[in-house]
Amino acid sequence: MKYKIEKNTVQETLILPLYSRKLCTELYPNLYRDETSVRLLDQIDYDFSEAEKNSRSLMQRFGALEVAMRQNDLAFEVRAYLKNHPCAAVVNLGCGLDNTGRACDNGRCKIYNLDFPDVIALRQQLLPAGEREQNIPCDLKDPVWFDRIDASGGAVFFASGVFYYFLTRQVKALVQGMTDAFPGGVLVFDAANRTAVKMIAKTWLRTAKIKDVGAYFAVSDAKSELSPWDSRLQVSSRGYMLGYNDLKDPSVSGFFRFLAKVGDNGMKMQIVKIGFGDRQ
């Protein structure tokens, strides 16, 4: 049975990133593989004609490369944490239909996928929780979900394309709350500077009728801007296009490598890593 997805629904917003990840897998097979997206799209009844028409455009192909690098970078940080904390909680914040937690599974960690209730309802149908895994419906801004996470073996949290939709004060409150609740844990997420966030926000802010783009979370220098939030934070960052991979692969053109450099340096597209120091 195929799951029908209607246009202009919350479910549709989950399908398009899935399509991007499938496109990455096809265009950049040496750099990125996401078999889950390929499998899930076979189970979905949705009109992909528009996405397919745009899929070979220059910006769509570069956008697919961005998605691939972001997922790879976050998975790298999750695996790095699990090397020292093999029984840790691996927590996907704003998971959608992303299966990074399962892709990083070492056979001992606990996997948590968090998102709004309607998103989790669809996820339960398409990606039911497996062994040592929970799909948790919640609002990330409400810390009530903290109690659902067993962090006795440590905790690594990651958020992909999520915090662009948060106000700076909301991200700050979340980070401060997590620092108290999960000492020794780590949070990794993608971020960009104000210019890039304005570009990202152009479409959805118009529909949401939000005027003050400046209130939304953006970062240029993560260490100097975020460290003052709490003395226990250990903040670092790396460019998200070239910080983990030089992209010297036959599937990536020289022009795309140039755009990647512009993204990392001009737009400050980065993976931010925040370590929560132990209680003082």
Feature-to-residue mapping (PLM):
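Rossmann-like AdoMet
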Residues: 1-91, 95-138, 151-152
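Short amphipathic alpha-helix with an adjacent loop that forms part of the alpha/beta core around
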Residues: 143-152
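A conserved beta-strand element that flanks and buttresses the S-adenosyl-L-methionine
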Residues: 157-158
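A short, conserved alpha-helix within the catalytic core of class I
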Residues: 165-178
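Conserved beta-strand signature within the Rossmann-like core of class I S-adenosyl-L-methionine
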Residues: 178-194
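Short, glycine-/aromatic-enriched active-site segment of Class I SAM-dependent methyltransferases
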Residues: 198-213
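Short alpha-helix
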Residues: 213-240
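Conserved catalytic loop of SAM-dependent methyltransferase domains
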Residues: 232-258
